[in-house]
Each structure stands twice: as structure tokens, then as C-alpha cells.
Amino acid sequence: MPGTKRFQHVIETPEPGKWELSGYEAAVPITEKSNPLTQDLDKADAENIVRLLGQCDAEIFQEEGQALSTYQRLYSESILTTMVQVAGKVQEVLKEPDGGLVVLSGGGTSGRMAFLMSVSFNQLMKGLGQKPLYTYLIAGGDRSVVASREGTEDSALHGIEELKKVAAGKKRVIVIGISVGLSAPFVAGQMDCCMNNTAVFLPVLVGFNPVSMARNDPIEDWSSTFRQVAERMQKMQEKQKAFVLNPAIGPEGLSGSSRMKGGSATKILLETLLLAAHKTVDQGIAASQRCLLEILRTFERAHQVTYSQSPKIATLMKSVSTSLEKKGHVYLVGWQTLGIIAIMDGVECIHTFGADFRDVRGFLIGDHSDMFNQKAELTNQGPQFTFSQEDFLTSILPSLTEIDTVVFIFTLDDNLTEVQTIVEQVKEKTNHIQALAHSTVGQTLPIPLKKLFPSIISITWPLLFFEYEGNFIQKFQRELSTKWVLNTVSTGAHVLLGKILQNHMLDLRISNSKLFWRALAMLQRFSGQSKARCIESLLRAIHFPQPLSDDIRAAPISCHVQVAHEKEQVIPIALLSLLFRCSITEAQAHLAAAPSVCEAVRSALAGPGQKRTADPLEILEPDVQ
């Protein structure tokens, strides 16, 4: 409501949503709830998809409601206070860098964000002539940065081993563990390990659920659940021996797709906090809320500037969707760190939409020699690990066809002669090229380069008169803006392809325990049947044609994930089996006869005796997270 906000905002955020009501999908964590804004996402055209996803992104900046303050938000006093405290702890390490280290850690999207931010802040420190103090850990190692290897985040011991390697011999280590849903065992193990040695370690947990919604099922190789670890951290926060930063940002526009808002909010929160620490330590003062708010407003401005390009974003979405529909490919070619954003978007389509790694791929143009921990892990590993300029020119360019779409992502500070050369080479193969070009007021794209593109999403940023660290605000804005555009385009393209039911991705590949629980939640949501029955159907679909034995039923979730990861259409088959009360073989036949997965499920839901729509998820038992 106007007039009730504590702070002045750059953008208009949506009114507090239905998802904030305590009874809405009560048993499901916020990060897995369905967003009421997008309940008809599957019926939207490209323009409306951009509008709806833009509204979901704006919820990141929503303040706590005056009448309805169920959850703490990014601008809540408690969150801002914790951010100031953590920034102060980072400053202590910056002031005495010998033996100091800041570790950013996570699995999947969170690990890729950890990678991107450690690269950025090391770059900032090198530019000041300082020794870089940041490193990153990603479940599964460097290969997980450029390829989809999601199952790796399910081991707490793996997380601890990796942390011990990088922290060996250090005297003061701040470990920022990122888990959007407060669910990744990889991070839980690290946080627990840090709490057992607070003389050296300071654990900081970042996620976007209340601690009461953190995952509470057993971790296979650890004695505590994620929720128990987070509760222990909250107790230690009273003495500033651990910190939990977990504002609510609302459900994802595509249910559970934490690469979107979860990834963006991670970037916004941590870059704000860390940049405030660097800016103020150089001035010899402590970080303040005022400094945090100034930086947060620049990210709000990024939202405004990005979504002012909505018509062109919708056009790009349609072009990408057409290429994918014709079985063509989409290549996202980005310069410098915008190339990292491009790689992330392509990789994340694999597990989000069950896409082939060749469908949407990102490439990084520019030097990346000092970005990775273990560059050797990425050399000669096969086509899905290729991402460099050389890879694009030697293995992609020769095989480009007219049905492929290539998106060039650069700033006007990049080497525009190099951009033009690559664009000209691509244009000989396909006319489906687009540009996402970032400029500062006063810069213009050279005419010869401009003429090569039929359409350009041109984003102009205001001049920022900041000191050195302030230059990074512009870099962070451009990265976030690029992420918003690419996430919206790739998500929307798959919506237009008919892959989404309401705002749920039914046909995802179950590649980790989080996705196993999400699959179970969807079966309960759409079938209205009991948890026990849904588990039975899910296990039958996973292990088919092997009959379900008591041994299989009693097996740990990792065994089911291992089998499910290799299979397609597990969830739709399990759901059709529940809706038609039929065998797995009959469910497969129903699916094969339908034009698409979503059509098969829609017609089953509309059949005699079925519920017409999915009810809000009140049937889930509280222990299913």
C-alpha cells in the first residue's frame, strides 16, 4: 500500500501476495510454492510471460507488509542489521588479510553464483593492488560450473572435504554457504563443520525460506538435518559466531525454479553486502544500512531499466522458441563475465526443462585463465564441457544452420571490432541473430555493427560518479540485467513450447533429492491422492520394468535418484498412472498417444471423476520438504 513503505523505492513492487498468507500451501517451503501471479503462465503469450516474470522478479524488493508481516524480507530491519554485521566481519578479514579467506559455496545455480562473485571480488582486489582473498566451492567441482551435474549437492561429506582443502593453513575463514531452499546437504555439512571450529571459521548461511521451512529429512551421510543445522546457527547468531541471512522473496514464477529469483536474490544480497564492506573499509569506516540501501537501489534500477525493454525481450523469446521447436539450437555468446551468465542460463535449461545440452548453450568470449580453481578439469572433457571462444569458432560455427538463433551479449566497453568479426562470420550461416548490448549514457554502437543486427535489446545505464569500487556496481547491474533477460527468454521459450502445466515444470529430470521431493509434491498436488500412494507410483515409474520389492521401497533416496536421473518422463508417467489408476505400461501408452506431456495430463485431469484443477497443496504432510 502506498504510504506504508519505510524506504523510497525505484520500482513499484506488486502488492503483498496470496503466498504470504499463513495457510497458503502451508506444508510447502516458499521456494517450492506456486506463485499466484503466474498460475496461468501456460496460457500466456510472449508479451504476458515477460510481464508476469518481471512482476515476480520485482517481489525480491517488496517490503514487509504493514498489515501482513508473515515473513522477513530483504528490506526488513532484521535482515539489514545482519547484513551490516556480516559486512563488518568481512572487513575484519580485509584489514588483516594474512591467513584470511572468504569462501562462497553452493551446489547448482548457487555454486555458479559463488563462482561468479568470487571472480568479481578477486578482480576488484587485484585492481587495488591487493592480494585476492576470495575463493568458491561448487558441488561436483569446476565441471559443474559449465555443465549440469546436479546430483553432486547431496553429500555433506563432499562439502566438508572440499572446504578443508581450501581452508588448510588459514587463520580466519568466512564461509558463505548458499542454498536457496535451505536444503543442500553439501552446504549443511560445511556450516556444521564451521560451527565446530569457530576459532577459525565463521559460517554465514544464505537462503530464501524461513528456518522452520528448511529441509528436515535425514541427510544420508550426515547426522543432522538441514533444519537442525540452521537452528543451531540461529542460536549462535546471538553471539555473532554464525549468521543466517534468509529473507523471503516469494515463490518462483516457474514453481521451484530457483535459478531465477533465488539466483538473482543471492547475487543482489551478497554483492550488496560484500561491496559495502569493500567501499567502507577503504574509507576507514564501518558499513552502514545507508550504504547497503544505496547499493540495493541500484539493483532496483537495474530491474526498471531491464524490463523497460519488454517488447524486445518478448521478440527474442519467440525467436528462441521457434528455433527450439524446429529442433534448432540457441547459442548465447557473451563477453567477459556476461559470458558466465550466458553459460549459466544454458546449463540450467538442462535440468529445469529436461533439455538436451545442445539446445541452449552459452559461450564466454575473453580471457578466463585465472577464473577457475581447477582449469584442468575442463580440458578435453567432451562437447558438453566446451564454452570458450575457440570452442565456439571451431566446433559450433562450422555447423550453424538457418534454424539456429545466436544471441550476442556485450557492453560498448568491450572490443567491438572482435564482436563485429564474429557476428559477420555467424551471419554467413544464419540470419537469426540478436544483440543484447549494454552502454552508458553518451556511448553509441558503431553504425557498421548496428546494421548487422535485425533487432537489438539496447540497455543504456546512467553515468555513475563513484570511486573505484563503485565501478563494480555498473558491472553487477549489467550482469543481473543480462541474467533477467536470459532467464525470462529461456523460461518463456519453453512455456511457448507447451512444456509447462499452469506454472509447474512437470517433465523435469529427477537428478537430486530436492527434485525427488518436488516430484512427490507435484504428484500429490495434481492427483489429490495420499502421500503413500504417490510415493508408490513414483517409485514404480522410476524402477520400471523392475517390479517394486520391499528392498527397493526401503532403499535410500540416493538409489532412486541414481535410477531416475537416467530416465525421461518419470513424473508424467507416475501422474497418469495415479489419475487413470492404471499400470505404468498403460500410463506410457496414454502419454505416447498425446501431442505433448502437458496435453496428456490436461486431458486426464479433465476426464470423468477427476478434479478439474489442482487444489492448493494442503494435503502434503509436513515432513515432505
Swiss-Prot record:
SUPFAM superfamilies: SIS domain (SSF53697). Residues 463-465 are annotated as: Essential for interaction with GCK. GO terms for cellular component: cytoplasm; cytosol; mitochondrion; nucleoplasm. Its main location: cytoplasm. It is found in: Cytoplasm; Nucleus; Mitochondrion. It holds the Pfam family GKRP_SIS_2. Beta-D-fructose 6-phosphate binds at residues 109-110, 179-181, 514. Residues 90-286, 320-499 form the SIS domain. Found in liver and pancreas. Not detected in muscle, brain, heart, thymus, intestine, uterus, adipose tissue, kidney, adrenal, lung or spleen. Beta-D-fructose 1-phosphate binds at residues 109-110, 153, 179-181, 348, 514. InterPro entries: GKRP_SIS_2, Glucokinase_regulatory_CS, MURQ/GCKR, SIS_dom, SIS_dom_sf. Residues 199-200 are annotated as: Important for interaction with GCK. Interacts (fructose 6-phosphate bound form) with GCK. Regulates glucokinase (GCK) by forming an inactive complex with this enzyme. Acts by promoting GCK recruitment to the nucleus, possibly to provide a reserve of GCK that can be quickly released in the cytoplasm after a meal. The affinity of GCKR for GCK is modulated by fructose metabolites: GCKR with bound fructose 6-phosphate has increased affinity for GCK, while GCKR with bound fructose 1-phosphate has strongly decreased affinity for GCK and does not inhibit GCK activity. Belongs to the GCKR family. Fructose 1-phosphate and fructose 6-phosphate compete for the same binding site. This is Glucokinase regulatory protein. The lineage of its organism: Eukaryota, Metazoa, Chordata, Craniata, Vertebrata. The gene is GCKR.
